[in-house]
Regions:
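Conserved hydrophobic helix-helix packing surfaces used for dimerization/oligomerization
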Residues: 6-8, 29
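Glycine-rich Rossmann-fold phosphate-binding loop(s) that bind the pyrophosphate
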Residues: 10-12
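Glycine-rich FAD pyrophosphate-binding loop
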Residues: 23-43
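Conserved N-terminal glycine-rich FAD pyrophosphate-binding loop of Rossmann-like flavoproteins
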Residues: 36-56
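Flavin-dependent oxidoreductases
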Residues: 184-205
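Conserved N-terminal helical subregion
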Residues: 1-6, 23, 50-191
Length: 205
């Protein structure tokens, strides 16, 4: 008897990681991504020891280490005068003894690509694009998911990983749209060779 899949709304980092974790436990999974292709928007992302433990469980440390950088330290500076507030050494013997796993930074797209590649290689996972979840109905036997194009998909359960403007969250919790904090963060990725020499340090600041 064919088991109905666990459905995941959203194929970003969270959705892909959830799909891979479930498939490794023997669950059939169907990822429903609203865009027409899988992709990740953003710049860098920090990978702490807790994340590396998860990556090891999923068998992804090799793929991540191929592109990630392990900085020497995490530095906090005063926003007004630039003075160092504290400096935390990383990836030394003491850090390894305390946390067992490393600390690294990588490009968000590289992390996402590694997850999607692993999902594509997993026979229990089906990746669907142009499949935006707009609603769902629970039942004793599972869940029926409504798509924007009018289609309907049956599954054992539904996981909402459809981002900041999540339709699943709005239906389930109904706490309104995200509130704007008034803060703006500017991010960019560029080759280290284009940085001024005095800024070419191997630290997260």
């Amino acid at each position: 008897m064919t088991r109905e899949p666990i459905l995941i709304a959203g194929g970003g980092i969270g959705g892909a990681a959830a799909a891979l974790a479930l498939a490794r436990q023997g669950w059939p999974v169907r990822v429903l991504e609203q865009l027409r292709e899988f992709g990740e928007i953003g710049a860098g992302i920090q990978l702490g020891p807790n994340v590396y433990k998860m990556l090891e469980t999923l068998g992804l440390t090799g793929a991540i280490d191929a592109t990630a950088v392990r900085p020497d330290a995490l530095v906090m500076r005063d926003a007004l005068d630039g003075e160092i507030v504290t400096r935390v050494p990383l990836n030394n013997a003491g850090f390894a003894k305390s946390f067992s796993y490393p600390y690294a930074v990588t490009y968000r797209a590289d992390l996402h690509n590694a997850l999607i590649d692993a999902c594509n290689a997993e026979p229990e996972i089906e990746l669907a694009v142009a499949a935006k979840v707009t609603g769902f109905t629970d039942s004793n036997d599972g869940v029926s998911v409504q798509l924007e194009d009018g289609g309907r998909i049956e599954g054992r359960a539904l996981i909402g990983a459809d981002g900041l403007w999540s339709n699943v969250r709005e239906i389930l919790i109904g706490d309104g749209p995200p509130r704007i904090s008034g803060h703006i963060a500017y991010r960019a990725v560029l080759p280290a060779t284009e940085m001024p020499k005095h800024l070419r340090w191997n630290e997260v600041v």
